[in-house]
């Protein structure tokens, strides 16, 4: 599997965002990977958190996240994996003919994932203006980056774009809304066409609506990537559930792209 080849062949790649839906269970992680493969997704994405790098023992949750009696630090500690576990996650994804991606939030997470062979880097909206963090990646890796812009105004997006154009890494600028779930009135699907006109790079959409309709409509634009949170069941409690779709919905989106490509590939003439 090759990132550039996928885009050339499929035009629009699908990124299954697992996020924290595994709830710290390595067994769940591998179940998610297998289900993503069955759905036909191209990239499986996680979040590489390290509590010591991102939080303190006194750090409390600002919004309700878990029913467990734990601090934010303890939560991130429970969510993190060892280097060996990350290697097994990456290996499993590649064995299932998909690419491995993860959001990074610290220099440590960058170094760990670089050593195990990450395929696609992800910069979350909250880190998109941390150019030093992005520079840590571009200094040691030529792998592509997905950069979300859910917390940025237009001037800030311009700054990110200009910075990335000075680097050799392929990158996709991702429109998204940092609201979970995103209200339909706030999604701003018009931003996709504005990005496509304004920026000389690949454009994508990171969806947090928790619906099937919004990503389907987004795919009607000439975007190169769709990132979407997935869960096994919308009835199970998880911080990401309201912003996620199910794997059956994910399979629908993957099949929708395949069918759309076939339709546009086989044109007919009324002149015969």
Identify the role of each PLM range:
Residues 1-272:
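Catalytic cores and adjacent flexible loops of soluble metabolic enzymes
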